[in-house]
Amino acid sequence: MKQSIQRLSALLLALALTLSLTLSVSAAETTSVLEATAEKAASAVMSYGQAAQVSWAVWQDGKIISSGSQRPEIDSTGAHLEGQGDIYGIGSVSKIFTTVAVMQLVEQGKLDLDKPVVQYLPAFKMADSRYKDITVRMLLNHSSGLMGSSFGSALLLGDASQQATEELLARLSTQRLKADPGAYSVYCNDGFTLAQLVVEAVSETGFMDYLRKHVFEPAGLKETWSPASSFELRRAPIYQAGVVEDPLPKECLGVVGAGGLYATAEDLAAFGGALTDDTLLKASSRKAMAAPEYANGLWPQEDFPDSLGYGLGWDHVEWYPFAQNGITALVKGGDTGYYHAGLVVLPERKMAAAVLSTGGASTYNEMAASQLLIAALREQNVEVAEIRFKLPAAKKAALPAELLDSAGYYGSQVMLKVELAEDGTLTMSYLDLPDLPARKFYYHDDGTFRDEGGSSALRMVKESNGQTYLYQWTFTSLSGLGNLPGSNYAAVKLPENSVDPSIQAKWEEQMSFLPMNERYSSQSYLLLGTALKELAEAEEATENAPGYIGNLRIDSETHASYTAQIPGTAGRDGYDVDLRRDDKGALWMECSNGTLGMDLAAVPELSTGKDNAAACTIQPNGYARWYKVGDKAAGKTLSVQVPKDAGFWAYDAAGNVVGSSLLWKDAPVELPEDGLIVFAGNPGAKFQLTFQ
């Protein structure tokens, strides 16, 4: 299965724009140290992550002490900069808002963190009896055992539909769990969408109405919004390089509680500040959120710090380098297709910093926010030492014979092939990233495999659950952003799975599945072009582990299942896959997270109709209508009359987007030879087509 619709979620392109930059800094009370640090950190975010625009804010003791932006120069008037600053999507930092709402209901005695979710959501059911053991706490600490992200029609453009949230319970009803509830914490978006539904059920209030009354207003947040809010003149623009020069429509995530909120850097920093006192939560609730929940389940037992360590909602409750200096630091990052956010809170110091960007990565933003806080503390004569961790001294050694059995295939978000030689050389290849060169590590007498520079190391660990994990240690230094330590399980060894070679071959046939049940406004259609390009440019098939297709275990000719159990993030977003053929022989792929795809080979040819006029009607099942551009239509100019809540996308043979009602409204499209066109909308929606 060379390509599948699931790969689209990984095709979130970094924006590399060559634009003139202006630096805007405003501060009530600031000094050159903090300003210089902010400018340097923002530049680093733009450099390392290719971010197009960055904004930041630092809050202390009830007020913003510094804020600013590095942004493209739009025009000389700066009209779009009215108010506090530009508004960005904050992605998964929204999870902290959801967590606060849950904890408020706990304080009111309306919720119990350790009661089953089904007690509050009787409609919540799954095709796995263990779902009854999932508690509210497990939703907030990522240990529910849910597969991960049921994000069909969740990542949208210019469309604030909440379809993904509304359909979550139906999607979960056919899913199984990937782990026992509470076994370990692994990043899980669906848990927070469920938590949003719990808040609505218990409070008997719409989620956004609840947040406005009980979170935004008490915290004084006037620049925090849902995707349905109107703030277009203030929204930080987003782009899709190589597709369209103009800014894209507003990015809308239909899972607000998991990642859909928008805010300014100032508002987000102020929200973090509100979590340093009793403004939103009692001290006991804030303490509960900051507890090391990750330690309740499977987790590497190492002395080195990592970039993850879940609390309730928080990504890390012992964030480097503050924890190593006796300072409590809480962090949450957020990444959407186009926006990235980092929030760091120092509750004991009554400080918080937020860094938001278009393009880039939340990790860089979190590191930048840390640098701002370090600089602010330095101005107050509080030094935070950025301790450089090193591996303990060890010498190269011959490989113990018993470790040779650790060679094999390891699964995570990427597939790894680990080869071991008797001289102690470990060669690690990235199977689904064949362009990346293999890495070599060398065995040392302390049991680690280290690279030549000593900047990273691996070790095989046999855990209490009987599985063998590939533990990784890293320590990275980035100018302007500080250091980033890593100490986590990167992958798990895949058990042997013997299947008939003919079945393996069928799964490995080059197939490209087209999205069939995504909304017309889905980012999948925009990003599909990249997947089609990859398919066209691929010279050879990706290697798979015997008995596996990617990280899925082949169970039969038509079913493959997700089996990796890894804490942290390496084991996130699993799904099972079923293949079937319809009565016309077309091959379909059904993923357990609700995604549905049809093989490109089954797409019919577009008809120009009678007298160069035709119609296309969406099927009763709501599935999209795909067509190939054949000889009859190639070269003609197509005009489309688009019905309400519907749209079309057109691609050339190389996968480039050449037409879109979402991007270019009713502009006619010159149909390219061997191209594709898709029409999507509600059941019965009728498109009128005119060819010239």
Per-segment meaning from a language model:
Residues 1-12:
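Bacterial N-terminal signal peptides that target proteins for export
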Residues 43-81, 113, 156-158, 162, ...:
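A short, well-structured edge-of-sheet supersecondary motif
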Residues 47-55, 77-139, 178-190, 256-259:
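Short active-site loop at a secondary-structure junction
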Residues 74, 129-337, 341-342:
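Short, surface-exposed loop or secondary-structure junction motifs
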